[in-house]
UniProtKB/Swiss-Prot annotation:
This is Large ribosomal subunit protein uL11. NCBIfam families: L11_bact. One or more lysine residues are methylated. Part of the ribosomal stalk of the 50S ribosomal subunit. Interacts with L10 and the large rRNA to form the base of the stalk. L10 forms an elongated spine to which L12 dimers bind in a sequential fashion forming a multimeric L10(L12)X complex. PROSITE patterns: RIBOSOMAL_L11 (PS00359). PANTHER family: 60S RIBOSOMAL PROTEIN L12 (PTHR11661), LARGE RIBOSOMAL SUBUNIT PROTEIN UL11M (PTHR11661:SF1). It comes from Shewanella sp. (strain W3-18-1). Forms part of the ribosomal stalk which helps the ribosome interact with GTP-bound translation factors. GO terms for biological process: translation.
Amino acid sequence: MAKKIDAYIKLQVKSGSANPSPPVGPALGQKGVNIMEFCKAFNARTEKMEKGMPIPVVITVYSDRSFTFETKTPPASFLLKTAAGLKSGSPRPNTQKVGTIARAKIQEIAETKAADMTGADIEAMTRSIEGTARSMGLVVED
């Protein structure tokens, strides 16, 4: 018989640096999960990724306090900022542009995120990433 699911916990944790401090510790502690066990497993799974990259993770907590977790791809905004060499997006994206990004780079990001996105095809996902880029104050070039 399958284990009974008690809760789902969604967090964004920096790759390779999960530790018991907030937000990880309090979120897992409330559900009675072994925090250090999660931190060690998460750090082991993300050790080959660029250190400090925010990784969304969905933790499934079972009624016996055991858990499983699934890591996802980094947020599109992080990938766009990295590709454009920015620290942050524009405070006023409609009037103040902060950089440019090539459409080919956006398509590459869409292909990276394809596993997590629910788009119909790669073109739809590319348009979605383009919208994110424009809302950050980036100009999309061909």
